[in-house]
Amino acid sequence: MHIVRIHQPGGPEALQLEQVAEPTPKSGEVRIKAMAIGVGRPDVLMRQGIYKWMPPLPATPGAELSGVIDQVGEGVGPERIGQRVLISSRDLPQRGGCYVQSIAVPHSKPYVLTDSISFQDAVSLPNLQLALALLQAANLNPNAEKRALLITGAAGGVAGMLSQLAKTHGFQTIGTARTPIKRDFALANGFDVVLDSNPESLYEDVMKATAGLGVNLAYDHLGGAYLPAYIRSLSSLGTAISYNVITGQPSVDVFSVMRELLSKSLGVRCFSMHTFDENESNRRQLMQQAIDSMASGKIRAPLPTVMSLNEVVQAHIILDKGETLGKIVLNPQ
């Protein structure tokens, strides 16, 4: 079978497509024939060798994979064969490992998929799981007025899921994106308003979009000049949640910005999905909630960019350039 490995961290060219023997499930394991593989930011960090949860080299990236159980190990019932499942490396002892055509994992780790969820859509479920956790982190008051929510990277997979969830809670959803193509994509995937992501004009643009009221919640994964602009765009008692700093740390003192706006009583929270690394019950409950939401049609996956496994280098070039629309999905077969 084919597998992607990193022997020496670097750019997209560090991803090597290699041929290895297909795994045989050990006692208590199942083998999954991959039908779709998700591509995301943690894969880039692993490729660069700077991922905090880096496995030993040679390493195989890939945080999620969907497919069919085609073989079981000793102690696992044969009725598992043929099950449509999703595996997330968040549930495995070691991160990554999903850029493969076949994988053997402990039998209790895969999530069973309903027939209504396609394999391509299934690898967006971890994005929905993260979106659910991000809303959970906001500690929403069910009785409070919900006006607007602001999200960076509106054309991305997590942002699209977060927007859909926020609308079910009664929020107007406002996204930001760098290019007209990305803004059109985000609008087509359910955002109410999508603004240019220029941090210099963001505050004024948000105020225009909200009749001068600002937003209750702001979700930022870019950092840099963006986070201070998002904080300024909050309404009184609003909260900004930072869940990554892709463009680096803010160059201005965020606390000084908050003190400047003291009369608004604003809050800032940092969030990481790794909060749930030692809380398997909550993590799996969030994923099951994500599966149920997608299976019912309440939440839908964004249109994916589908590429073959042997195009993995090109997929990472797209990621590095920030040209992703929705979710990049690799077809391994």
Locations of regions flagged by a protein language model:
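Mid-domain Rossmann-like dinucleotide-binding core that forms the NAD(H)/NADP(H) cofactor-binding site
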Residues: 123-200
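Short amphipathic alpha-helix with an adjacent loop that forms part of the alpha/beta core around
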Residues: 201-212
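N-terminal Rossmann-like NAD(P) cofactor-binding module of classical short-chain dehydrogenase/reductase
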Residues: 86, 216-219
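Glycine-rich phosphate-binding loop and adjacent beta-alpha segment
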Residues: 225-298, 332-333
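Short, glycine/polar-rich helix-capping loops at beta-to-alpha or helix-loop-helix junctions
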Residues: 98-99, 177-185, 252-257
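Glycine-rich beta-strand-centered segment in the early N-terminal region that forms part
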Residues: 21-38, 50-91
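C-terminal capping/lid region of NAD(P)-dependent oxidoreductase domains
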Residues: 212, 291-292, 296-306, 313-333
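NAD(P)H dinucleotide-binding glycine-rich loop of Rossmann-like/cofactor-binding domains
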Residues: 78, 87-153
